[in-house]
Amino acid sequence: MRKYEIMYIIRPGVEEEAQKALVERFAGVLTNNGAEIINTKEWGKRRLAYEINDLREGFYMILNVNANAEAINEFDRLAKINEDILRHIVVKEEEK
């Protein structure tokens, strides 16, 4: 398994309960596919560098995980489909 950092931005209009459910759902996608979540950071609502779908703000979430390729691919696939996630990026951390 490799270390990854995942950052995703949630649409600002999502209610707090739905936002928590979304975060838990995507954490579940990773853990159900064999990933281990090391750290979760909620950056909260921040201004976007540029407009995405006419939106200027979003809720930022950052995850550090140990995962295999299958877990990352499934997360990526579902994040692309979900309309409440504006953008996401997965970065592989280098071995030291």
UniProtKB/Swiss-Prot annotation:
Pfam families registered for this protein in UniProt: Ribosomal_S6
Signal peptide: none
Keywords, in A-Z order: Ribonucleoprotein, Ribosomal protein, RNA-binding, rRNA-binding
PROSITE patterns given in the database record: RIBOSOMAL_S6
Molecular function via GO: small ribosomal subunit rRNA binding; structural constituent of ribosome
GO cellular component: cytoplasm; ribonucleoprotein complex; ribosome
One BP annotation, GO: translation
Function: Binds together with bS18 to 16S ribosomal RNA.
Family: Belongs to the bacterial ribosomal protein bS6 family.
Record's protein name: Small ribosomal subunit protein bS6
